[in-house]
Amino acid sequence: MSDRDDFRLDGRVALVSGAASGIGLECARALTLAGCSVMLSDLRDTEGQAVTDDINAAGGNAAYTHLDVTQEDQWVRAIVETLALFGGLDVLVNNAGIEIVAPLVDTLHADFRKVMCVNVDGVFLGCKHAVSAMRPGGKAGRGGSIVNLSSIAGKRGVSFLSAYGTSKGAVKLLTKDVAIECAQLGYGIRCNSVHPGVVLTGMADGFFEQHKALGVADTIQGVQAAFEAAHPMGHFGTTRDVANAVRFLASPASAWITGAELSVDGGWAAR
């Protein structure tokens, strides 16, 4: 096997949550380009099926299933469908998430709980059922890699993101707990987190709008300039930047990496 082959995922199977757009979609594309069969999942079925059709039209091997990550029975079904269609499960990308931008004193408890339910409970449930399938004796039983999407907000304090930052910090530590447990039990399952800075997606558009409303700057361009300056490299990231990191952590090239926090943030976390 060549060094280049270490980055391939031929014969492997992945499940990606929140895959109808943005980072999740780009992760699904990157994994299929590496030779992986991918089950895309999301709440937005029309968009999810459309992008799955696009991936297949481009030569990929992908399917789509509905998944509300807060519902345990839907995780069970999604993994059963993945196993039935593709014959295994080697990679889980826990990408689905939501964000609320608000001052602490204006954040409703119900909204805080909603963010935690999607961003933390969803990752917990995905890890739980993926590990059950991937571990020795499981329905897949050949080990694998779990990649959890956290954020720069899971490593650094950021104003107006008390709910989101708390949830992403929890994802960071849950990742380490899963990594250590799987390693000590000899499951052959690695678990790592990816921490993007600001990436230009539909979620980022809302992020900028909400910060403008909070008076961070008078214009959207001013808000963007303020956040762009937080990245020492001087520009925002792309979904491809994040997807390439996920592909690396999913591949044999990262075989001795588990419990790690991979920052994809133009240097923000290094400040």
Located regions from the model:
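Short, small/polar-rich loop/turn modules that mediate ligand/substrate recognition or access, typified
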Residues: 183, 188-190, 257-259
